[in-house]
Amino acid sequence: MAAAALLLGLALLAPRAAGAGMGACYDGAGRPQRCLPVFENAAFGRLAQASHTCGSPPEDFCPHVGAAGAGAHCQRCDAADPQRHHNASYLTDFHSQDESTWWQSPSMAFGVQYPTSVNITLRLGKAYEITYVRLKFHTSRPESFAIYKRSRADGPWEPYQFYSASCQKTYGRPEGQYLRPGEDERVAFCTSEFSDISPLSGGNVAFSTLEGRPSAYNFEESPGLQEWVTSTELLISLDRLNTFGDDIFKDPKVLQSYYYAVSDFSVGGRCKCNGHASECGPDVAGQLACRCQHNTTGTDCERCLPFFQDRPWARGTAEAAHECLPCNCSGRSEECTFDRELFRSTGHGGRCHHCRDHTAGPHCERCQENFYHWDPRMPCQPCDCQSAGSLHLQCDDTGTCACKPTVTGWKCDRCLPGFHSLSEGGCRPCTCNPAGSLDTCDPRSGRCPCKENVEGNLCDRCRPGTFNLQPHNPAGCSSCFCYGHSKVCASTAQFQVHHILSDFHQGAEGWWARSVGGSEHPPQWSPNGVLLSPEDEEELTAPEKFLGDQRFSYGQPLILTFRVPPGDSPLPVQLRLEGTGLALSLRHSSLSGPQDAGHPREVELRFHLQETSEDVAPPLPPFHFQRLLANLTSLRLRVSPGPSPAGPVFLTEVRLTSARPGLSPPASWVEICSCPTGYTGQFCESCAPGYKREMPQGGPYASCVPCTCNQHGTCDPNTGICVCSHHTEGPSCERCLPGFYGNPFAGQADDCQPCPCPGQSACTTIPESREVVCTHCPPGQRGRRCEVCDDGFFGDPLGLFGHPQPCHQCQCSGNVDPNAVGNCDPLSGHCLRCLHNTTGDHCEHCQEGFYGSALAPRPADKCMPCSCHPQGSVSEQMPCDPVTGQCSCLPHVTARDCSRCYPGFFDLQPGRGCRSCKCHPLGSQEDQCHPKTGQCTCRPGVTGQACDRCQLGFFGFSIKGCRACRCSPLGAASAQCHENGTCVCRPGFEGYKCDRCHDNFFLTADGTHCQQCPSCYALVKEEAAKLKARLTLTEGWLQGSDCGSPWGPLDILLGEAPRGDVYQGHHLLPGAREAFLEQMMSLEGAVKAAREQLQRLNKGARCAQAGSQKTCTQLADLEAVLESSEEEILHAAAILASLEIPQEGPSQPTKWSHLATEARALARSHRDTATKIAATAWRALLASNTSYALLWNLLEGRVALETQRDLEDRYQEVQAAQKALRTAVAEVLPEAESVLATVQQVGADTAPYLALLASPGALPQKSRAEDLGLKAKALEKTVASWQHMATEAARTLQTAAQATLRQTEPLTKLHQEARAALTQASSSVQAATVTVMGARTLLADLEGMKLQFPRPKDQAALQRKADSVSDRLLADTRKKTKQAERMLGNAAPLSSSAKKKGREAEVLAKDSAKLAKALLRERKQAHRRASRLTSQTQATLQQASQQVLASEARRQELEEAERVGAGLSEMEQQIRESRISLEKDIETLSELLARLGSLDTHQAPAQALNETQWALERLRLQLGSPGSLQRKLSLLEQESQQQELQIQGFESDLAEIRADKQNLEAILHSLPENCASWQ
């Protein structure tokens, strides 16, 4: 049965036409026919896939007896063994009955049994039309298995056939199902036909795809069956094994005998190509595909090629090949698609796309819409019909469009003549004004072509600067004349037409003829007119009525009427006009008259007096043409040479059209001008009141400018000279009369006020402060109101510093430069700039370091320099006596300049003086020595620098000198003898002079030496020696006894022995006295130096200028103590000098020695006290200077940062000064110790001899010494007391300085917060700019005054005034800047409301007090801080200056600041609301004011303000925008202005203080460099 079904499928799929070649798609005639690929086993060689295959792992299987391959033993399946594997490749390999191979699944022992299925999948690579599927089993066939297929590669699995003995149970399908005709034939059947267990081997299962399908015999017409047989993949699902039922015992041998095994898997069918291909093969991608014919494409030739869409695609059948036909696109496209509707209606379904050449239609057979072509072979062209002018956009075959009425053109793109503005409604008619247009309107825009002076779309109005639109005017409108001052004019109704006429009825009427040579003569006149002779080339000159102002003839005709012979042509006549330096010629522009050839005729020649006329030479602009007519000086007619006329030619009439005042007929060409400001008159020919000609007497053509009389008078409109009033003068009333002051530029009657100066002398006003300053004070006076004395004068005219004192000329003894400035003090008259080395209130003394007469008439005889010798003078004292010139010399130094030593002294050394020669009183002839070497003049035989020893070969040092030794040259060992005159003898010689031989010695024969006598003489010599020794012993005993000789042995008294050693002690006491006096003088010098240092401290503390009272009192007391000490020392020195010291004194200590010891102790204590006083005073001076500098800076009103910095610098200076004092004490201490050692040495030397004072003869001296000791003790106590006071004063000053430094702590915080206050300076920029302009004007006036007073002294005075004014302007600028800080202080720091309160209070406090720089961060804390700082400032200012404002005013101002601080809380809410809107503005302000903060104080204010003016203007525009912010700023500015008014009084006082301070600084700078300075 399976074989029968298989044969049926093959028969149905085979071609019906016998003999038709299935491989050819075209027959022998080239006609298409169906073609099919070969029928094949599609499974052969293709690799099938099995889900389960035995051998992995290897296993044993036991075939049933009777099965193929069954034997006695079981076999083994091993996938790794090529001989024993049974993989899926054996399904589709070559099948042989003899050598069978098979695929085998695992046995039941491995779980292969229902419901576990084993699947075999076969992929065909493309769609095949399957005829049958055959399976040959190596074992028994399965009890249940199924065949599935896929119609397309990505399609679902579809059931193909089910085989099962339990169809319903296993697959849910009935067994033995069949189909009726009309039912869906794509249904899988289930059958039990092949489900028996027998045969055990080699059973076949053949499935025919068309078996049981009713339409199988009509396969070509059944798409369902065609799709049913189509498959791309096949799947065999082996679901249940057939068993004998012995598997239930699970015997392994039994289970190993049940498994699936297939030896062959065959699929019969053809490659599906739908009848359009005869073969299949791999494509470029290696995939199996049909090689399509019949213009088809696709893997299965399932569609037509893109351009072969003329009919629908269809399978090729035996009856028809259904070849795809190409589309008909008329050669204008290569793309088309199949359109079923088009095919249904036309039989051709190919619809072309993307037709070229602007064609359209299914076959590109016609032009697109709005395109055309005149030849079907040509491309279509666009119609381009104008949409607005065409009835529709489609044109005919010629491209001509159908136009709307009033529209023309091939494309209906233009209007007909007389129409314009093509639109959807067609064209509109032109409405050009014929008087102003030249032709019809532009057909596109409708704009009319206007004449030169006409404008508008319709040419219906004159251009600006013209008027009187007239048809006969070639330019349309006439140009406005208005004397060049206006371009706006119109026709006036106040003038009528007027004709200037010459008809020659009564003669030539003033016309003259001029020949070529230039001579004038009356023309030839007859009743017919004036005879013209063209051959003579004469000119006719018009009379006066045609000349002059003929502006009203501009643009009007000048008509000449001639009487000419019949048939003659018009004469070539030229018209020449001259006037105002201009000239031009015109030719006639028209000809009129009857053309009667038989009679003489009248001919009119018309000339238009306008620049647009033809043949105008040279061409002139309209204004110049009218200017020529305004002053026409000559009008001449000239007949050019030409053909001789047939008869006489007469000029019968000349008519010039003009105008004159009247109403009818109106002369519309006369203008009335609309004059700009400053002009008046119908033609703007006059200057309006208050205006003048820019060029005096310039006439109506000159421009008018405003009178520059500053509202103080009127000016002549032609000359411009002002007639001034209101006490003003000048060409422009720009200054007040002498004796008046004010700002005449304000334009008010009371601008100039009488000067409040003596005798109403001249004055001026500072522009910003409005301060009146007198400029011509009486001789000897100066100042803003002449309130101070002029340079070189002194006094107090207004009694500002006491009783009024008139100004007197300073008396400086002729020792000042009369041309210098600041020679004397303006109040006291004390001279400040003394010359010729003079000083004093009136330069009546010589300066320190100079001597002579300061009042000498000749400068050479005045003060001369001391020129003290630097080595011999005392540098600490005054250089010299101011009268004698005697310098203060060091000890033992003399001469006026201390250039040499006293007699008896030598070796001049700096700081020490001269040393004593110390010439020996016995050995020297005098007590003087050489001033350089110190060599004394010795007595005979004496040598040594001090003549204190005998020369070699001399002895007997005495008052007479030394005597010669006269030692025997033969017997003496040397020329020098002993002090007793005995010589040193050679052996064998003896005697004082060694001039004899010893006893028992004799002189040799040669006389060279002494020879010993024989030995017998020795005994005698020994005995004589014994006797001599006893004599010597006796002699010694006699010398040791007191025999009334106080000085020595008798031989000394007799002059037999030296006397130097004996007499030397007689001079010890006088030498000690001199040394002691020298030390006393040194002590006196030290006291003087201390006094001078105290005086310098006194000056440094400004005790002469109301300095610190406590400090100055202590310094005065110290000076009194030093003065008393000096007096005591001088008294003691005088007593010591007057004492008579005896030649000898007691050897025991006396009371005098004790007093001397006490004096040394007192001197030491005095020296130490003086050192401490100097150190304390120096510290007091530094502390005072520091405090004074601090107070002075506060008085000047410097900012907190500068105050803090200065105080810190001063504190460092105090510490540096203390360190310097310690260094100075360390340097002075060795010198003091040296002095003390000297005093001690002197005391030790004199102590033995001072004991003589205990004798009765010394009682007066001892009494004096006791008094001196008592005074010294009192001096010590006084010095100790004042030392204590000085220490306390220094401690007090040190405490005050530390307290002052502690006051800077709030100023440090002020410095941090004051930087933000600089952001409040912008709103005063404009006012400051005006200030600078005023300052420049005033300085220019001062420079002018400088030219009037060329003397140097006057120049200096003017320069001082200019400096004062500049300083005031700068102060005023600072004031305005601070006012701006206050104005912006309410708006700028909006970023922080709490910080805003502090900054606002800081501005008020700084501008009010100039001393308290603390900020009001919070109202209460700021108030307490300001009060504390103000109280400290008040206490300090009372000691530093009498010009500080009263504390009551500061208290009121601080209360005002407190009230302002209270008002800040009310503004806090408004500030918070405005914060967001001003954030960007704050950034701009911060950048701007950062530059202001870094501004150099010496930079001109104008320069700085000009640099920032543009940024401030931009910010002002932003802040000036309307809104709530502007209103709030206005309120803040009003409040700031109120505060400004309250502070102005205090600022005025501060300005006065600054002025006084500047005067003091000027005095300070004028002092010589060696004068005392308190800075």
Swiss-Prot record:
Laminin N-terminal domain location: 31-270
GO molecular function: structural molecule activity
Keyword annotations from UniProtKB, A to Z: Basement membrane, Cell adhesion, Coiled coil, Disease variant, Disulfide bond, Extracellular matrix, Glycoprotein, Laminin EGF-like domain, Repeat, Secreted, Signal
A biological process term (GO) from this entry: astrocyte development
Domain of life: Eukaryota
Domain notes: The alpha-helical domains I and II are thought to interact with other laminin chains to form a coiled coil structure.
Illness the protein is tied to: Cortical malformations occipital: A disease in which affected individuals develop seizures, sometimes associated with transient visual changes. Brain MRI shows both pachygyria and polymicrogyria restricted to the lateral occipital lobes.
Name of the molecule in the record: Laminin subunit gamma-3
